[in-house]
Amino acid sequence: MTVKTETAAGASTLTYSKMRGMVALLIAFMKQRRMGLNDFIQKIATNSSYACKPSEVQSILNISPPQEPELLNENSSPPPSPSQQINLGPSSNPHAKPSDFQFLKIIGKGSFGKVLLARHQADEKFYAVKVLQKKAILKKKEEKHIMSERNVLLKNVKHPFLVGLHFSFQTTSRLYFILDYINGGELFYHLQRERCFLEPRARFYAAEIASALGYLHSLNIVYRDLKPENILLDSQGHIVLTDFGLCKENIEPNGTTSTFCGTPEYLAPEVLHKQPYDRTVDWWCLGAVLYEMLYGLPPFYSRNTAEMYDNILNKPLQLKPNITNSARNLLEGLLQKDRTKRIGAKNDFMEIKNHIFFSPINWDDLINKKITPPFNPNVSGPSDLQHFDPEFTEEPVPNSIGQSPDSILITASIKEAAEAFMGFSYAPPMESYL
């Protein structure tokens, strides 16, 4: 079977075998994207078939799972059970409990739990509820990251392109984040369907993403995990960033950090080199996402992860001629391997904002959502789940998620020396409910 396709250069022949190869490439790409970075790297590192790879790349692959110094448990004894470790103290929202909600559908999954569509029994509003298993968090010593995510969420209420936290609470076994419900679908989902976007649409999304990143940077927060899976579209088509588990707080304008974390396709060269890095890693990721929106795959993508890492470190950026000069210039600046020469290295978001590629954007109108999005997800209401993966929505909701007998609710009377999730529960000031 042969298919004829017309291109700017004329007619070309696309064989069936080539089509199968392209499909296989995309399927492999999507599967790898769903795998956790640590687990994936460990699988690669222990695979003898990579023994002959360049030493530079091999040194990257042969690492143990990264941990921040502050995440290391100084006490070598087994951790207490979750119920013993928690102390809510003077909880701001002592009355919130799982049975306040009707849990309707599973709409996502992560390393430590699920995200569910839920309706509050009292006000009948819809929320996305992120439910995390304490046991899994404590086992991997990720409690500081979870608390960091909560802290970042509390600061998001002032920005239109960051998902907001309404309140949080916990039981002996689970943590509950009550978040904005966003049902326009992941950017990843829409890229899967459409392969790539026209430049005006990509510019609109990149501008809203850059605005959100700039706001986080103004709070001395580095996002570190920008990728299409973490970028949602709301019901009107505006961008909403979510998943702040890898955010790093307290990074001053000239400050650095060194934790090896992120998603393979979007790791900046300095992260792969295991060098100290700064907030410019977010601008590298913005460049990678913009490239993917325009071309359909990340800039240095390969099915072979070792080869992809080598590409990120050493291969020159290749740009096809079907984009404008301003887009080309921005991509070259964002995907600059030397972070000191990267766009954003000197004046952070202001450099991105003032780039000629964004000259059609009125930034005041953008932040006030006065610009009509180039794409409308056309959702009929909160119960419209057309943009969620059926793999999630068709799974039954566990009954235990919505159960909250008095005996398992954490109260302020529980006091232990090791307080892993102290202060997790949160409720906004009373006037926020009015």
Curated annotation (Swiss-Prot):
Top enzyme class: transferase
Chief localization: cytoplasm
InterPro entries, alphabetized: AGC-kinase_C, Kinase-like_dom_sf, Pkinase_C, Prot_kinase_dom, Protein_kinase_ATP_BS, Ser/Thr_kinase_AS
SMART domains: S_TK_X, S_TKc
Gene: sgk1-a
Residues at the active site: 225
Domain (AGC-kinase C-terminal) ranges: 359-434
Keyword terms: Apoptosis, ATP-binding, Cytoplasm, Endoplasmic reticulum, Kinase, Nucleotide-binding, Nucleus, Phosphoprotein, Serine/threonine-protein kinase, Stress response, Transferase
Protein name, UniProt field: Serine/threonine-protein kinase Sgk1-A
Recorded superkingdom: Eukaryota
Record-level Gene Ontology MF annotations: ATP binding; protein serine kinase activity; protein serine/threonine kinase activity
Catalytic activity: L-seryl-[protein] + ATP = O-phospho-L-seryl-[protein] + ADP + H(+); L-threonyl-[protein] + ATP = O-phospho-L-threonyl-[protein] + ADP + H(+)
Region (Disordered): 66-94
Biological process terms in GO annotation: apoptotic process
EC id: 2.7.11.1
